[in-house]
Amino acid sequence: MADNTILQYKCPCCGGAIEFDSQLQKLRCPYCDTEFDADTLRGFDEGLKSTADHDPEWDSYNSDSGSGDWREGETDGMVSYICQSCGGEIIGDANTAATFCPFCGNTVIVMQKFAGALRPDYVIPFKIDKEGAKTALKNFMKGKRLLPDSFTSENRIDSIQGIYVPFWLFDADADASMSFRATRLSHWSDSRYNYTRTSYFQVLRAGNISFDKVPVDGSKKMDDTYMEALEPYDYSQMVEFGTPYLAGYFADRYDVDADASTPRANERIKNSTVSAFTSTVKGYASCTPVSTNINLTGKKISYALLPVWLLNTKYKDQTYTFAMNGQTGKFIGKLPVDRKKYWKYWGIVAAITAAVCFALSWLIM
């Protein structure tokens, strides 16, 4: 049976289906009236095929410091604590007693012998102590007009713990090319009509971007939104891992390996690349990406522990969790809202808006 194939070309300018005009002997878009030579359009189509989007593949993680195994005697005196409520596991030295779970605040913690985890390559040591974290929470609550008064006066920090969160750090050089559909508008009028002309353009961009230490957290228990909101870290202060840095703190055991983290790394690299390239397209009314091709080279994965302070506080039988970057002091969290203050605030805004509108209408009349 013959292979019947219908080949349809799309207009690079507006995306409409292109037809062959027998009188012009050219391909023509009936939507924007753009004309194309067949060879030109064929070359554009081949270019799009060569820039088909795909997810880059990464080699399996290999420890920067060797095999990823702990050195002889390095884990002596280290223990694991497992929460009987949420199943969270943290690692620390035997002299640092865990009396609560930093993830859910539960106090039922079981200590057991530490075993079975990869040795990290790097660590960023804590720069801010516990008192600094408490002060940051107080500063975070200042100026919040809709915060219940009782939350501040009755607020007690139920648990506060410095914890090293496992992160996979991705390095890569991105060779990228992109095609955009851009438009420019021109307006004019005569005695009868107002006119708008839309001109379509194909814009091409290509270049190289180096990505150094793109972080993806390796813990299911940590909220990804929180962890990314705590960025950026200053990686110039990152040092080779050593167990002395764990003294007085805990380390979350990773439960998302490097392979499972690569899709998020690819997504972050792609989004950053598209954003960087799009920012160079200027002078147009609109700009829409049509195709993107990203080829990653020099790929490398490292395993690091990054410092985070977790604070839990209860208010009206609800637990509120806050997190702070243990290096930079960046603080995030969700606060309760006083419903009475909320409606009072918007009532005042509505009243002021109505008064202004009334005054303007009176002046106009």
Language-model segments: residues:
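Short, non-ligating residues that shape and space the ligands of small metal-coordination modules
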Residues: 18-21, 38-39, 92-93, 110-111
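Residues immediately within or flanking Cys/His clusters that coordinate Zn2+
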Residues: 6-8, 24-26, 76-80, 98
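Juxtamembrane/start-of-transmembrane alpha-helix segments at the extracytoplasmic/lumenal side
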Residues: 335-346
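Short metal-binding segments enriched for Cys and/or His
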Residues: 36-50, 109-118
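Short cysteine-rich clusters marking metal-coordination/redox-active sites
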Residues: 11-14, 29-32, 83-86, 101-104
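Charged, low-complexity helical/coil segments in non-catalytic cytosolic or luminal regions
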Residues: 116-314
